[in-house]
């Protein structure tokens, strides 16, 4: 299967249609908006009582929905493209919260001079934390653990010898 970086108009229409069909099957009445096309990012709007159900714990249901949309669209279009599914800007807010958390914990590490391990999180969230602190002169980050228990440890950088 060929990788497509910028989807065609038809690819976008197919993707929106697939997501709308899945939402109808889930009995969720909402609208789907295209936020960007590189990568193709769809945002689900107008969700009322089912928002928590759609997002799931730490975005797990939303990630599963995204995987399902990627698989169906890939099968229909016969090529691969990166599709991101968001709900009421949850992913955007989560990213901002993770950056803020990384900065707060880095300050605690500086104050208490001890490493702090964050909660277990999926790879894309750990990456956000690593990137948020990458330019820090005195802080380092490291992912530890296995599988779903993988977490980021934030520490003071060791002085060069």
Predicted segments, located by residue:
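RNA-contacting regions in translation and RNA-metabolism proteins
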Residues: 1-161
